[in-house]
Amino acid sequence: MKAEFVRILPHMFNLFLAVFPEIFIINATFILLIHGVVFSTSKKYDYPPLASNVGWLGLLSVLITLLLLAAGAPLLTIAHLFWNNLFRRDNFTYFCQIFLLLSTAGTISMCFDFFDQERFDAFEFIVLILLSTCGMLFMISAYDLIAMYLAIELQSLCFYVIAASKRKSEFSTEAGLKYLILGAFSSGILLFPCSMIYGSTGATHFDQLAKILTGYEITGARSSGIFMGILFIAVGFLFKITAVPFHMWAPDIYEGSPTPVTAFLSIAPKISIFANILRVFIYGSYGATLQQIFFFCSIASMILGALAAMAQTKVKRLLAYSSIGHVGYICIGFSCGTIEGIQSLLIGIFIYALMTMDAFAIVLALRQTRVKYIADLGALAKTNPILAITFSITMFSYAGIPPLAGFCSKFYLFFAALGCGAYFLALVGVVTSVIGCFYYIRLVKRMFFDTPRTWILYEPMDRNKSLLLAMTSFFITLFLLYPSPLFSVTHQMALSLYL
């Protein structure tokens, strides 16, 4: 007995190290919650506002989690299954979680100036961001339908609350309520097919489902329960990533939510959900059907995103439709059904996340003057030329103009589409990119050539957003000079899905 325990001890220790980042961030989240509750209600300390204090501690917790995740990297030479095989840790999980944590850290660093300007003292905001990050970390590593659904619900419940966190704003309350109702509907769409698949196969584990679906593929048999289950899971995922025709909720919720929440909703859930889509749909005999669904949604998202954004007059609604369009471009990678398509999808997600973080950091920097409409950006080049140049670089990258990172992302996605024979998909992507140039360049024209109705003196940005903008702009501008690291990482991630 003792010898057996000594033999398995190194394996248990490795598994503990593999899951330790999630354990740490969960404990840190609850410690911050207790810290906030105790001190914010303390008469001794005169009921201090703790949003910024908890924000800094939350940022530190995310960075420590990032270091713990990096420390476990040498253990990922092979895939590890843990917690009764509910979760899987491999290179794909590792890199997706690292990028998710970087996105969370970037979002939190954008919040501090917002707390001061809005006199926002609800420390629960940061706690909910950390808790939703826990859910997304588990979602990325989920290897079972039950674990997947519970992780999605954990992150979704936090999103419903933070969307309505600006209590004095009717728009924020409306956004949170809409998100709650429609999110509950999409969660039902996800839960129902999971039960259908379990009823048809008696399995919820992805490995077991892969073997069953491979058996169907070999024998040529079909199961209506499995087919409908996979179809409804795809619909639930498409709703979560705001792909057309399941996008209706996104513009209103993105506009009504506080700007840091909009930034978080635009970036973090897409990383985790696309990662989970790849986990769920990488196996099975229904790949051709799923490719057709993503093919249609990709085309519809690109067209609607490009055309609807042209009619927008508000900055956040324009960015919402831009996000829908970029989801269409990213879905090209899944529509290909090849390893090159998956790699291009991962490159597209990472570059989109950096561009979106950059754009929302600028929108938050302009919030000091309550910039809401595109017309409010008039003559920004004269009042704050550095910010105008940075915003212009981001818009050109969104439009896919070389030599910026956005061009490389779209080029690789279109190249993957051409490689698998999806010529029409690539053609629609190129045409919608050209149409999209109109509304992106219109913003640049407003900043450099239009005269505002009233002149505004912009205050300098705080250090956190300045540092964030510097790093993201540096990557967007100089990515094409040395793209090999990202290509190498995404290739490893794509390969690890098949191992």
Curated annotation (Swiss-Prot):
**Main subcellular localization, coarse class?**
mitochondrion
Q: What domain of life does the UniProt record list for this protein's source?
A: Eukaryota
**HAMAP family in the cross-refs:** NDH1_NuoN_1 (MF_00445)
Quaternary organization: Complex I is composed of at least 49 different subunits.
What's the name of the protein?
Answer: NADH-ubiquinone oxidoreductase chain 2
Q: Where in the cell is it found?
A: Mitochondrion inner membrane
Keywords, alphabetical: Electron transport, Membrane, Mitochondrion, Mitochondrion inner membrane, NAD, Respiratory chain, Translocase, Transmembrane, Transmembrane helix, Transport, Ubiquinone
Q: Which gene encodes it?
A: ND2
PANTHER family, per database record: NADH DEHYDROGENASE
**Pfam families, alphabetically?**
Proton_antipo_M
Q: Which organism is it from?
A: Arabidopsis thaliana (Mouse-ear cress)
Query: Recorded E.C. number(s)?
Result: 7.1.1.2
Coiled-coil ranges per UniProt:
none
